[in-house]
Amino acid sequence: MGTKQAEKFFSYYYRWGDYDLVSSIKKAGFSCDDVTDVIYTHLHFDHCGGGSVWDKTKSFYRPLFKNAKYWSNKSHWGWAKNPNPREKASFLSENLFPIESSGALSFVSEHDTGFKHKQELNLEIMFVNGHTEKQMIPKIQYQNKTIVFAADLIPTSGHLPVPYVMGYDVKPLVSMGEKEAFLNNAVKNNYYLFLEHDAHNEIITLKNTEKGVRVDQSFSFNQLFN
């Protein structure tokens, strides 16, 4: 969500963990200058607000990561800049303009279905359209594991049942179809799902049950990779 807004704005939401992205990065042993690429899965404020900050004089906004390319896609960027009434309050100009005007914005090439390798980033991305137009779901290989950043396709473990979609979804029936196909592939290919909105389950694996796909195991990032 970032730190640009006033406390009244933040009072409407429950923030979990470190509120400051900079301190979180520092705890991991890095600095903002080390970041080379930022992938915006989509441009709702809770997914991109931390990518830009006030300058020291609080006279203008600037990208937080001065050495990074910020990745979106052309369709979703246009969707956010000309928003529909349902999503308008989630697409904030102060999150978009600093990235675009700084020259840091780059677009990923688009495709229709499934995960495909993106030469620009050397990882795979899937596009989904139920939550918002052309949301990007990244998949990476790390330490012999396949990790998928589930973004708002599956925000929490409570959203694993196919009918349980977010109230924010612009096309809930599309979301259900996208989620069902993804979950089946996730079980088949033993994906590790990183859940952005789940305060209690950071990374999960999945299994088939008589009620559908459900959580198999739950890990913190440190448990899995340290």
Language-model features: where?
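Active-site glycine- and acidic-residue-rich loops that bind
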Residues: C48-S52, E124-M136
